[in-house]
């Protein structure tokens, strides 16, 4: 859990993913298209990935635990949540508030 907190606070936008996850790819692409440059942590390529995945579930991440998105050091949700925030316009404002994007 400590590693999740540490990694999620190092950059304005952080996404925990798995390299083979299509929804993870979609969320990363959305962030890039909005002008953000999130830190990406591929759990399937990290020796502590399984442990971090359990920690993400404990934070309230859904099943599957990825993508798990943090903005401004705060967990904001998984793919379903991020798409909802994008549709209602609040994702862009969250990214602006966290200084992950400027425009």
Curated annotation (Swiss-Prot):
Keywords: Cytoplasm, Disulfide bond, Electron transport, Redox-active center, Transport
Domain Glutaredoxin, residue spans: 1-102
Any one GO CC term of the record: cytoplasm
Swiss-Prot/TrEMBL GO biological process terms: negative regulation of transcription by RNA polymerase II; response to nitrate
Keyword Cytoplasm appears in the UniProt entry: yes
Primary location: cytoplasm
PROSITE patterns linked to this entry: GLUTAREDOXIN_2
Subcellular location(s) of the protein: Cytoplasm
SUPFAM superfamilies (alphabetical): Thioredoxin-like
Disulphide bridges, residue numbers: 21-24
UniProt KW Cytoplasm keyword: yes
Gene3D superfamilies, A to Z: Glutaredoxin (3.40.30.10)
PANTHER family: GLUTAREDOXIN
Functional summary from the UniProt entry: Has a glutathione-disulfide oxidoreductase activity in the presence of NADPH and glutathione reductase. Reduces low molecular weight disulfides and proteins.
Similarity comment: family membership: Belongs to the glutaredoxin family. CC-type subfamily.
The protein, known as: Glutaredoxin-C11
Species whose genome carries this gene: Arabidopsis thaliana
Lineage: Eukaryota, Viridiplantae, Streptophyta, Embryophyta, Tracheophyta
């Amino acid at each position: 859990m400590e590693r999740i907190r540490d990694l999620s606070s190092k950059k304005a936008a952080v996404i925990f993913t798995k390299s083979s996850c299509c929804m993870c790819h979609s969320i990363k692409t959305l962030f890039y298209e909005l002008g953000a440059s999130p830190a990406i942590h591929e759990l399937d390529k990290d020796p502590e990935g399984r442990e971090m995945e359990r920690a993400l579930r404990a934070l309230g991440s859904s099943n599957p635990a990825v993508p798990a998105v943090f903005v401004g050091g705060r967990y904001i949700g998984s793919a379903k949540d991020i798409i909802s925030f994008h549709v209602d316009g609040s994702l862009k404002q969250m990214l602006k508030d966290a200084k992950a994007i400027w425009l």
